[in-house]
Amino acid sequence: MKVHVRKSDTVVVISGKDKGKTGEVLKVYPKTGKVLVQGINIVKKHQKANKSQVESAIIEREAAINSSKVMLYCNKCKNATRIANKILDDGTKVRVCKKCSETF
């Protein structure tokens, strides 16, 4: 499954419990079409005690969300935006904001 965002992109959540929040993409899972975004979709994980860790604990961490729930954030527009692919004169392919033509 093709994912429209890359690692270290700034994205905005457009639906779900974290709607409107922005964060940086930490990891992309192209096979499942999910992304891990910093500070978004926080879940509680119950950690069992083991030899290296003496006590059990409840840890809060990010969980992956579907890539269709995020849009790329344009720093120039200060808004979520769709992206277009543009080929420059030297043949390199870049991602461009559809609203203001800012390159990513």
Curated annotation (Swiss-Prot):
Gene3D superfamilies: 2.30.30.30. Coiled coil: none annotated. InterPro entries: KOW, Rib_uL2_dom2, Ribosomal_uL24, Ribosomal_uL24_KOW, Translation_prot_SH3-like_sf. Keywords: Ribonucleoprotein, Ribosomal protein, RNA-binding, rRNA-binding. One of its GO terms (biological process) is translation. CDD domains: KOW_RPL26. GO terms for molecular function: rRNA binding; structural constituent of ribosome. It holds the Pfam family KOW. It comes from the Bacteria. GO terms for cellular component: ribonucleoprotein complex; ribosome. PANTHER family: MITOCHONDRIAL RIBOSOMAL PROTEIN L24 (PTHR12903). Part of the 50S ribosomal subunit. One of two assembly initiator proteins, it binds directly to the 5'-end of the 23S rRNA, where it nucleates assembly of the 50S subunit. Belongs to the universal ribosomal protein uL24 family. This is Large ribosomal subunit protein uL24. It comes from Clostridium botulinum (strain Alaska E43 / Type E3).
